[in-house]
Amino acid sequence: MKTGRNDPCPCGSGKKYKKCCANRSASSILQEMKEDIHNLIGDRSFGSIEEVQAVLDQYQQQKNEAPVEEFHGLSSEQMHRFLHLPFESPELITFPLELEREPENKAAFLLSMLIKGIGEDGMKLTAKGNLGRKFCQAAHREYYARYPDSFMANLSVRSELNFEPLHAIRLTAQLGGLVRKYKGRLLLTNKCKKALDRNGLRELYPLVLHAYIRKFNWAYRDGFQEIPFIQQSFLFTLYLLRKYGNTWRPATFYSDNYLRAFPMILEEIERKPFEEPKDTLQRCYILRALQKFAGFFGLADLEQVSEGPINREYRVRSTGLLKEVVRWSL
């Protein structure tokens, strides 16, 4: 049976075939496998085809279970589950549906403001279905008073679309079934009210986080091309933060190791006249995966180490919340 381009690569890397061995010559792949099998079998003799098959099966299993250097200790089998079954692999990771303590981060802060603003009576929306200007302006002031950014704080807010973090949270809350539109108003759903009564943000935060991972399109928040694999591989980003985030490291440390694990992703990058695909990917990954995912949801701290609002450079470390959001069994 022919391997489809979107199927897991038969080499055991955990990547899709089109992003791994699809462009390697058949002869080079076969030669590599031939050498591995020769080293495994050596001068052994076999009494049946079944014995040979058992050895080959053992070879493939060992290959799948062996740690891969580029994956920082993960095997190709584990990486496959990270990429394709992150929420269905309890032997590796679980995602608690309730936190031990009230979360304090940008996403939780905006979610709390949105829920309070909606209240029991709902919130009137604009003719275009967006949050009202006054609410957005007030939320903008409070947000940047708590999380200072001199450049973003001075931007004019005329509509919800001018306050992108709030817009992202509102959309994600809708996708997660926590709020809904009805007759020109935004209302809390019964699901949201029940979770709010039971455990407040300790239960609401995981719901929004999971909706952001599974339903929200991360590329919508920035000006880069889609590159959906960055979102699909969210768990590997968190794994790197868990493994190396106990100390401050440059954001490029994570983007470099991400590219080292998935070099074929460069083939998806649209070429630009004055920028290498590697540099485009680096900027996109740092913004999309580190700033607007891990940083926004409080799973990592990002501290700017450069001057000015253009071409910002950051250092990164993980937070205690990461250990609560993902329980690792590795």
Cite the ranges covered by each PLM segment.
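Short Cys/His-rich zinc-binding micro-motifs
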Residues: M1-K15
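Charged, alpha-helix-forming regions
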Residues: D57-N64, G129-R133, Q137, A219, ...
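Leucine-rich, amphipathic alpha-helical/linker segments
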Residues: F82-L110, G117, G200-S255
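Short acidic, hydrophobic short linear motifs in intrinsically disordered regions
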Residues: K124-V157, G245-D279
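Accessory beta->alpha helical hairpin/"wing" motif in late/C-terminal subdomains of nucleic-acid enzymes
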Residues: I169, R180-A219, D301-L330
